[in-house]
């Protein structure tokens, strides 16, 4: 059976049928429709005003590659200036190859590129060093938690370095739907309530951020890269298999097989939740250490780094953060500074506090909480 004629130009043979509309389109017409939808998303959401200097988070992967290419095509109409900002997390055997892809893209499209590294920004810590530290505490699956927080901070610092007024990232609809599922499965109502907005307005000292590909499915992002002959880095991060996101991704695929519109349904549901009046969070404060936006005394990045520097990476995640809301020690990888652990109160030998009126003060945040184990006080080995 011959392929149908393109629904748009009525001349060329169709190369695909779009899942969301059912329209059969040829390659050029699909790319034009894709770019028009991204333009409509940016204009409808008032995401990038004329004259904006936009820092594009560039990882070398398909999403950031497509985002940079589309915005480069739309830049004259939007009146914006683009600057690629890449983050070197310090992942051996992975990030070096990805950064080469970013450099190649920057040279081909004649876009300025700035690379910022975890090691320079966070006192010598790289993701490989973080992974070794968290593995020693039995929390190897938390690598992506650390990386997500630190990467966000690094991108912010890189954007400020180049004088950007806005930050854009390549999160697509599948990424957003996975995040909605993750927040729901973890019972994180706060993130559910604010996770569907197209972008932040840049409260306080933070730069405005947005996701122009939020309503573009992963399949269509890949198809756009194919028809535009875009080359990108396609290997998965070596720490990704340990992440909880993988389970949400598998669940999303099952849901999509039963209901093709499941991805966009989840994205739009999160958007409606974020627009509800009751969902508006209280205004954020500032971190007592670095001045970044924070809902506690310390921002997430500083709290995570403190846990690593004190040899207590377990306490830097979840409820343990309350223990870390104290004056932090100097930044730096402890394995490079001293082999002795930071002095902390002697942990009690019990597993739980039996006296409801006298909760444990050595690591438990409430009656019945698990105390800090003695193994947590061991120095971090490089």
Curated annotation (Swiss-Prot):
Provide one Gene Ontology cellular component.
Answer: cytosol
Q: What is its EC number?
A: 2.7.7.-
Location comes to: Cytoplasm
- Output the GO biological process annotations, alphabetical, semicolon-separated: protein urmylation; tRNA thio-modification; tRNA wobble position uridine thiolation; tRNA wobble uridine modification
Residues annotated with Phosphoserine modification: 200
Q: Which UniProt keywords apply?
A: Cytoplasm, Phosphoprotein, RNA-binding, Transferase, tRNA processing, tRNA-binding
Write down the SUPFAM superfamilies for this protein, in alphabetical order.
Answer: Adenine nucleotide alpha hydrolases-like
* Origin superkingdom: Eukaryota
Say yes or no: keyword Hydrolase present: no
Q: Which GO terms describe its molecular function?
A: nucleotidyltransferase activity; tRNA binding
The protein's matches in InterPro entries, at most eight in alphabetical order, are given as: CTU1-like_ATP-bd, CTU1_C, Ncs6/Tuc1/Ctu1, Rossmann-like_a/b/a_fold, TilS/TtcA_N, tRNA_thiolation_TtcA_Ctu1
* Pfam families on file: ATP_bind_3, zn-ribbon_14
CDD domains for the chain: CTU1-like
Q: In which pathway does it act?
A: tRNA modification; 5-methoxycarbonylmethyl-2-thiouridine-tRNA biosynthesis
Q: Which family does it belong to?
A: Belongs to the TtcA family. CTU1/NCS6/ATPBD3 subfamily.
Its subunit composition reads: Component of a complex at least composed of URM1, CTU2/NCS2 and CTU1/ATPBD3. May form a heterodimer with CTU2/NCS2.
Function per UniProt: Plays a central role in 2-thiolation of mcm(5)S(2)U at tRNA wobble positions of tRNA(Lys), tRNA(Glu) and tRNA(Gln). Directly binds tRNAs and probably acts by catalyzing adenylation of tRNAs, an intermediate required for 2-thiolation. It is unclear whether it acts as a sulfurtransferase that transfers sulfur from thiocarboxylated URM1 onto the uridine of tRNAs at wobble position.
Q: Which PANTHER family match?
A: ATPASES OF THE PP SUPERFAMILY-RELATED, CYTOPLASMIC TRNA 2-THIOLATION PROTEIN 1
Q: What is this protein called?
A: Cytoplasmic tRNA 2-thiolation protein 1
Q: What organism is recorded for this protein?
A: Rattus norvegicus
